[in-house]
Amino acid sequence: MPPTINMGIPGASSSVTGGVSGKRVLLAEPRGYCAGVDRAVETVERALEKHGAPVYVRHEIVHNRYVVDTLAKAGAVFVEQTDEVPEGAIVVFSAHGVAPTVHVEAAARNLKTIDATCPLVTKVHNEAKRFARDDYDILLVGHEGHEEVVGTAGEAPDHVQVVDNPDAVDKVTVRDPDKVIWLSQTTLSVDETMETVRRLREKFPTLQDPPSDDICYATQNRQVAVKAMAPECELVIVVGSKNSSNSVRLVEVALGAGSDAAHLVDYAEDIDPTWLDGVTTVGVTSGASVPEVLVRGVLDRLAEYGYGTVQPVTTANETLVFALPREIRPARS
């Protein structure tokens, strides 16, 4: 096994050059499932074990095609709206969170709800509620229409404005420039978010920061790992679905950090052999909603093309685990 290339950890080296000639893969670590996704997927699995099929899930539990298809085969039924769930049935809310109106709709239909919202998303919801109570204008940096943004904005619709990107700052107006705070979607590009905030602060100099980082640890860690390996890569392959915000951001980060090309794939079969023409070093990573089996498939496919040497590039070690929703926790013995 080639040596692990550590970066960002005490005693780590500061270069990804591993001294290996010929074709190779640099494999980002950390990658794949974050604690919130792991919790959400296990929530649906446990609900199916406890209650049997069907278990309804509002929106995709996480933004990954393979995960959704696998759970659907096991008996999960994915719906877009609460009124698609039969009265009295079990419904799981996705990791992205929902607006308070959705809880009201569910109660009106006598639904048995299991909330799989990521605790880090819940934190942003609570911040929105808190600052709305204090009558702040809340500038929510995030992608208009994304489920997480819809849910967070729904906590305080009269106080929240969504700021989609740095160029959207020009259109932002507030009631009192001395009473403004920014919050963010948890899965954004750190660099683009900071550029948006920089422009907001130019416009509103007393803009307040969130009490703590809103962009989640896993999103940041995966972007840092890609930045570490991308300068050494002619190609970076990101395993993830097109509707996964954090996966799409990894493609952007790879290109911005120096990779000649970067592509998003759901499966190994999506790799176009022409991408590999003239390529010596391929970087591989995966979004926070991607199971490791899909990454292994990509590595196997690359090995078929001669990229059998795999060097991990480690920038962080993740140990965080979130407790399951109380409705499906195992009974204590």
UniProtKB/Swiss-Prot annotation:
Pathway assigned to this chain's UniProt record: Isoprenoid biosynthesis; dimethylallyl diphosphate biosynthesis; dimethylallyl diphosphate from (2E)-4-hydroxy-3-methylbutenyl diphosphate: step 1/1; Isoprenoid biosynthesis; isopentenyl diphosphate biosynthesis via DXP pathway; isopentenyl diphosphate from 1-deoxy-D-xylulose 5-phosphate: step 6/6
Residue positions binding dimethylallyl diphosphate: H63, H96, H146, S244, S245, N246, S289
Residues at the catalytic site: E148
Binding site for (2E)-4-hydroxy-3-methylbut-2-enyl diphosphate: H63, H96, H146, T186, S244, S245, N246, S289
Binding site for isopentenyl diphosphate: H63, H96, H146, S244, S245, N246, S289
Catalytic activity entry: isopentenyl diphosphate + 2 oxidized [2Fe-2S]-[ferredoxin] + H2O = (2E)-4-hydroxy-3-methylbut-2-enyl diphosphate + 2 reduced [2Fe-2S]-[ferredoxin] + 2 H(+); dimethylallyl diphosphate + 2 oxidized [2Fe-2S]-[ferredoxin] + H2O = (2E)-4-hydroxy-3-methylbut-2-enyl diphosphate + 2 reduced [2Fe-2S]-[ferredoxin] + 2 H(+)
Protein's GO biological process: dimethylallyl diphosphate biosynthetic process; isopentenyl diphosphate biosynthetic process, methylerythritol 4-phosphate pathway; terpenoid biosynthetic process
Family listed: Belongs to the IspH family.
The protein's name in its UniProt record: 4-hydroxy-3-methylbut-2-enyl diphosphate reductase
Organism taxonomic ancestry: Bacteria, Bacillati, Actinomycetota, Actinomycetes, Mycobacteriales
